[in-house]
Amino acid sequence: HDDGEVDIKGRAVNLTDLYVYREKDQNSGAADGDLVFTMNTNPRSVARYQYYFSTTALYQFHITQVGDVNSTPTGRADIILRFAFSPPNNQGMQAMAVTVVRGGSQTTTKTTVKGGFIATTPLNSNAVLNTVPVGGSNLTVFAGLREDPFFFDVEQYFRVRAGALGTGYNVNTITVRVPKAFLQAGTGANTFDVWSTVSVRDGVGGFKQFERLARPAINEGLVLTPQLMEAFNTISPRLDLSAAAAPVRQEAVATLNAVDLLDGKDNVDANAIAKAFLPDVMRIDTTRPSGYGSATNSQGSLIGGRLLLDDVIDITLGALVGSPVGDNVSYNGTPGNPAQGHKPLEPNFPYLALPN
């Protein structure tokens, strides 16, 4: 959820979570065929304070069109959705440039279908929902602060009463409604691999990948050595199975083995689990209902994307130890425990709860 900060990495360029789901599985009244992508950054943002997106970074969704749901991810993007931000104006709004890289061409859009600039939503303002024309389709784009929907009992290590990381904090979110037809681009693909990245200026006029995130608790939970985590963040998923990435995989397997033995039993094949989780992408089969633990393919990889209320930590820990595991927290929390519980999700796009 949060792999920490270093001198050159502030929270504005720190990825926290990726969500990918069919919109009709979040809102039964939504149009059939639309997907929602959510990229959250800026973890541990305190309440009632305006945070901004970096003006020197590129925030990106990478998408692969997958022909066979049981195949190993290629980690090669067929489509990239890229977002760049200007400095805020006197109303606290940042203008966005939305770039689509697809089919060998690149198109940048800075205005909505009505001709206005693509704008973020300042704190304590009504949501700005930008309809952005790209490649013959319309994307709906929201960018701004929302409550962090993540929940995990990390505090249980330090005190008896269970708490839920994320409660009371905000994140900067980029949430996009994307028509499936736009992602298919004539291929007929119904399955997609998605991952998010942040790139920063490289000092010589270009950008370099700085952060990467897809499935929860992979690079933040399995890769513990700072140097290896930094290396993992800078490579494409297509290199996850390469010889150069072998030290990262070895550390992930060692961590898996350690977690597996917490109950004193060797329950799972750590190498098989690592194979199911790497390359690290979020796969979604759009022919079935969304949900992080709703389905796996023949390789044991999760293929249901991720909904906002999915208990991803319980699902992930269960896979790692070979049996159901619960951390006793949920999005809604336990009645009477003020350390748990989030605001209700919004009924309409972008769905995340209003900021604290």
Range-by-range predicted roles:
Residues H1-N356:
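Surface-exposed extracytoplasmic segments
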